Design a protein with these regions (language model features):
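Terminal-region recognition feature
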Residues: 1-149, 153-156, 160-172
Length: 172
């Protein structure tokens, strides 16, 4: 909501959607993937709108890409089980279409009260790192920009990317 957006702005940070909109070519078309993921889920934990992550397919300098941005307004960008599923879908789209993928990282890591539900099978969190390696072997460019918090499991994405950028004063 608005108070959480204002809190991000007070820290000198953009929201996930603002970051993506700033990055993508303004005059080109883009589409958000899974905007309603997480709708009505995890209400006992305060909810997880959009799965806590924003995914868009759009163009950067005329090149079609997948952009994934943690939403720090949702539990400080922590990963819920649906967050992992949405990230996996973004990677799947990138692999199927051989599109570069850009991760805008601002995450407190796994949401600890639900960590037992994030790692249990091959279609969960650990699969993301397998996909990183697979995309690397396929020659699919992966770029990470650390925009804010980058701890625990969330720190592996930048390490496994082809390039990692750390934003001065807001990244940690």
């Amino acid at each position: 909501g608005k108070p959480k957006i204002e809190k991000e702005h007070a820290k000198g940070k953009m929201t996930a959607r603002e970051r993506i909109d700033y990055l993508l070519d303004s005059k080109s078309k883009s589409i958000e993937v899974g905007a309603f993921a997480g709708d009505g889920m995890y209400t006992e934990h305060g909810g997880c709108p959009s799965g806590g992550v924003v995914v868009k397919i759009g163009y950067i300098k005329g090149k079609q890409c997948v952009v994934v941005a943690n939403d720090a307004t949702v539990k400080a960008g922590a990963w819920f089980p649906i967050t992992a599923k949405k990230n996996l879908r973004a990677q799947e789209i990138a692999m199927e279409n051989k599109l570069p993928i850009i991760y805008l990282v601002d995450s407190a890591g796994v949401y600890l009260p639900m960590q037992d539900e994030i790692f249990p099978d091959k279609e969960h969190f650990g699969r993301i790192f397998r996909n990183n390696a697979q995309m690397s072997s396929m020659g699919i460019t992966q770029i990470s920009a650390i925009m804010g918090s980058c701890v625990a499991g969330g720190a592996y994405l930048p390490v496994m990317s082809d390039e990692a950028i750390i934003v001065d004063k807001t990244a940690s």
